[in-house]
Amino acid sequence: MRGVFFVAVAVAIFARSSAEAKLLSEAAPGLAADAVISGESRERFLRVADSEDDDLAAPADDGKTEERAPKFKSLSEINKKLDEEVMVHVSKILGNMGAIHADNIAKARAALEAAHKSGDITDKQLAAGLAKLV
């Protein structure tokens, strides 16, 4: 294993000093072109500049494809909209509270009766527990 390591190090040293190393270190023209963002599309670097790739090409800039202004003009409008959405969510939760409460009481009653049936609690404890559930 050491011999293979030393051979690999020697090949790397010779490759670095040879003229072929310059060719290996240069990027392929296609890769370099993909990495460079043209000056006109710096704001919109996600748009494709290559005309060969029609699937990802951006539509022609006819003035209709410009980015639209946001719907909200201030933070107070955004906060108001978020508050409205939160209140709708809270009202849905509060609307379901009766069903949630009834379900929890039924589960607690079943647990108390199961504990009484198995002898873990007395009749008096069962009555006190059921009275607290009301």
Curated annotation (Swiss-Prot):
Compartments where found: Secreted; Host cytoplasm; Host nucleus
Chief place of localization: secreted
Record has Transmembrane as a keyword: no
Residues annotated as transmembrane: none
Signal peptide region: 1-21
Keyword terms, alphabetized: Host cytoplasm, Host nucleus, Secreted, Signal, Virulence
Listed GO CC annotations: extracellular region; host cell cytoplasm; host cell nucleus
Basic and acidic residues bias (residue ranges): 61-70
Region annotated Disordered, chain positions: 50-72
Signal as UniProt keyword: yes
Disulfide bond positions: none
Intervals of motif RxLR-dEER: 44-68
Family according to the record: Belongs to the RxLR effector family.
Miscellaneous information on this protein: Avh238 is highly polymorphic among P.sojae isolates.
Free-text note on domains in this protein's UniProt record: The RxLR-dEER motif acts to carry the protein into the host cell cytoplasm through binding to cell surface phosphatidylinositol-3-phosphate.
Role: Effector that, due to the lack of a histidine residue at position 79, is not able to induce cell death in tomato, tobacco, eggplant, potato, or in A.thaliana.
Protein name as annotated: RxLR effector protein Avh238
Gene name, Swiss-Prot/TrEMBL: Avh238
